[in-house]
């Protein structure tokens, strides 16, 4: 086992604090509407420019092991906030730095770190309750747009685009962000249920220009096994032909004779038909077929349920207003399923997604939920250069997460005002002893740090801003750094999601408390390099002097 370096007490804390400061100082320049960019070197390709706090934090690795420990613990704050709320990472970093600095001063002055931690926890709990109580639900899409705009650092076009996407697909819908190849940023909305399986044969195509199959009011047969022969299906095919409506077959696979027969019938014009593979694999395929059955008002034809293909009747088939199939995707628009059954299925999937511990499963369940409940919107981020597109995509991701958080838990005044005003709740609050009271004071002071940093980044003296905002009794009065005006933050449209503010404080206090209560730090000792190791002794080459005679 490698030898270790161990530092104790103030030596350990000071070295870790240095790392905390390096990381926090790099991250906090990005805070607020007038925050600056950070340029990050990449081992390949062009450097990356970003204003996203967590992207900066993740890139920082320090040479000194003890400083790096401090920096990594602070990085954990940004990562955790990003995972839970998706935004507010810079705010969380600024809060954590302030709590750590003030806390370490108190420890150096001889106070008990554990009591300081208890005081900090007490204060944080009160502030969290205050933020929850003062948050207001998001009323309309203009507020969604404002939240998005603030998170995208004042880019109103991004805010409006996210609001439009949420209008289209609803709160349950999935909104994804992709890099576009063009200069413009655009919104693409897929209505209905779409899954990534295309037609099994190009002979099914009905629109040769667009290379896709279009079906109006088709019957939909959902079969969970492979179709190798059409013999068992003849009765249902006869019934469909007589109804003169198209038929879409969704099965595990359609192969060999079955596919050939379908294609021949399609080409002869007797049967309007198309076949696609069922989406997903294994158990997930069964679940998605069940979703499709509920959406289209049909039944999954499954041997497990004792239903054979020979006995299928028209009322077991699903139906939809329209189906579009390209070579990669199938989209079912306006399935005729029963609304109450769809609602029940949505509730069931939502419960599964809340209970699952696997992130992958949760993501897949969310996708299924969106396809059933709303739809899918894609924001395609464009720009002149790759660097610009990546930087903009970071901001769109943040804005999207912030708007989701706002819809979930409501909004509070932005610009650091909600935290600053909450600090008034801590005035006069006392702990069980003087050290706990000091812990409460540390949090009260830290709550000023976000608004101070926003002011500093816009070239205004932070303490003057804090003084002016605190003088005004209104809970929504603050400083708009974009225009450098004082007034009602909600009227200015400067709002933050309550969840983001709450998570930032919670995570900052949690990691900062750990740093304050650290009494020893252990790291790998630097390896001793042997002097000039590796090269053989060259003393034997002295004889080369004799080569003079060869010239």
Curated annotation (Swiss-Prot):
Catalytic activity from the UniProt record: ATP + H2O + a folded polypeptide = ADP + phosphate + an unfolded polypeptide
Matches recorded under Pfam families: Cpn60_TCP1
Organism superkingdom: Bacteria
GO BP terms, alphabetized: protein refolding
A single MF term (Gene Ontology): ATP binding
CC terms in the record's Gene Ontology section: cytoplasm
Record-listed ATP binding positions: 30-33, 51, 87-91, 415, 496
Annotated signal peptide: none
Keyword Magnesium: no
Subcellular location(s) per record: Cytoplasm
This enzyme's EC code(s): 5.6.1.7
Alphabetized UniProt keyword annotations: ATP-binding, Chaperone, Cytoplasm, Isomerase, Nucleotide-binding
InterPro entries: Chaperonin_Cpn60_CS, Cpn60/GroEL, Cpn60/GroEL/TCP-1, GroEL-like_apical_dom_sf, GROEL-like_equatorial_sf, TCP-1-like_intermed_sf
Transmembrane regions: none
Primary role: Together with its co-chaperonin GroES, plays an essential role in assisting protein folding. The GroEL-GroES system forms a nano-cage that allows encapsulation of the non-native substrate proteins and provides a physical environment optimized to promote and accelerate protein folding.
Assembly and interaction partners: Forms a cylinder of 14 subunits composed of two heptameric rings stacked back-to-back. Interacts with the co-chaperonin GroES.
Entry similarity comment: Belongs to the chaperonin (HSP60) family.
Name of the protein in its database record: Chaperonin GroEL
This protein's encoding gene: groEL
């Amino acid at each position: 086992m490698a030898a270790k370096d161990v530092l104790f007490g103030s030596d350990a804390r000071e070295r870790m604090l240095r790392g905390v400061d390096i990381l926090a100082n790099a991250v906090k320049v990005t805070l607020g509407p007038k925050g600056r960019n950070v340029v990050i070197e990449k081992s390949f390709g062009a450097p990356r420019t970003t204003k996203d706090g967590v992207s900066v934090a993740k890139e920082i690795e320090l040479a000194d092991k003890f400083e790096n420990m401090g920096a990594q613990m602070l990085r954990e704050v940004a990562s955790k906030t990003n995972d839970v709320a998706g935004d507010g990472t810079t705010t969380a970093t600024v809060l954590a730095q302030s709590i750590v600095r003030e806390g370490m001063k108190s420890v150096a002055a001889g106070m008990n770190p554990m009591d300081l931690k208890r005081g900090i926890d007490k204060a944080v709990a009160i502030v969290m309750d205050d933020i929850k109580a003062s948050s207001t639900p998001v009323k309309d899409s203009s507020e969604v747009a404002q939240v998005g705009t603030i998170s995208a650092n004042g880019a109103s076009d991004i805010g409006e685009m996210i609001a439009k996407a949420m209008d289209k697909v609803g709160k349950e819908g999935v909104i994804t962000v992709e890099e576009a190849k063009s200069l413009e940023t655009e919104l693409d909305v897929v209505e209905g249920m779409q899954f990534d399986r295309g037609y099994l044969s190009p002979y099914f195509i009905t629109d040769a220009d667009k290379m896709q199959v279009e079906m109006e009011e088709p019957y939909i047969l959902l079969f969970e096994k492979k179709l190798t022969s059409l013999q068992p299906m003849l009765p249902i095919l006869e019934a469909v032909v007589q109804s003169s409506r198209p038929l879409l077959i969704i099965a595990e696979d359609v192969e060999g004779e079955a596919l050939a027969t379908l294609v021949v019938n399609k080409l002869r014009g007797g049967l309007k038909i198309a076949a696609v593979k069922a989406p997903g694999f294994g158990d997930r395929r069964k679940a998605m077929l069940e979703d499709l059955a509920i959406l289209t008002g049909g039944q999954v034809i499954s041997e497990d349920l004792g239903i054979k293909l020979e006995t299928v009747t028209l009322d077991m088939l699903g139906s939809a207003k329209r189906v579009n199939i390209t070579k990669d995707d199938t989209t079912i628009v306006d399935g005729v399923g029963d609304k109450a059954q769809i609602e029940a299925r949505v509730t069931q999937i939502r419960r599964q997604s809340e209970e699952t511990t696997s992130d992958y499963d949760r993501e897949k369940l969310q996708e299924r939920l969106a396809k059933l409940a709303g739809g899918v919107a894609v924001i395609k981020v464009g720009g002149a250069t790759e660097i610009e597109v990546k930087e903009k995509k970071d901001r769109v991701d943040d804005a999207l997460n912030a708007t989701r958080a706002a819809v979930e838990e409501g909004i509070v005044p932005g610009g650091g005002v909600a935290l600053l005003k909450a600090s008034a709740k801590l005035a006069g609050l006392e702990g069980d002893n003087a050290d706990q009271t000091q812990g409460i004071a540390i949090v009260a002071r830290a709550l000023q740090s976000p608004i101070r940093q926003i002011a500093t980044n816009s070239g205004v003296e932070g303490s003057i801003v804090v003084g002016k905002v605190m003088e005004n009794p209104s809970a929504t009065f603050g400083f708009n750094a974009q225009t450098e005006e004082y007034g009602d933050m909600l009227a200015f449209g400067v709002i933050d999601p309550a969840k983001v503010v709450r998570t930032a404080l919670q995570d900052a206090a949690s990691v900062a408390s750990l740093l304050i209560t650290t009494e020893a730090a252990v790291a790998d000792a630097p390896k001793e390099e042997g002097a000039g190791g590796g090269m053989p002794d060259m003393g034997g080459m002295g004889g080369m002097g004799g080569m003079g005679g060869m010239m």
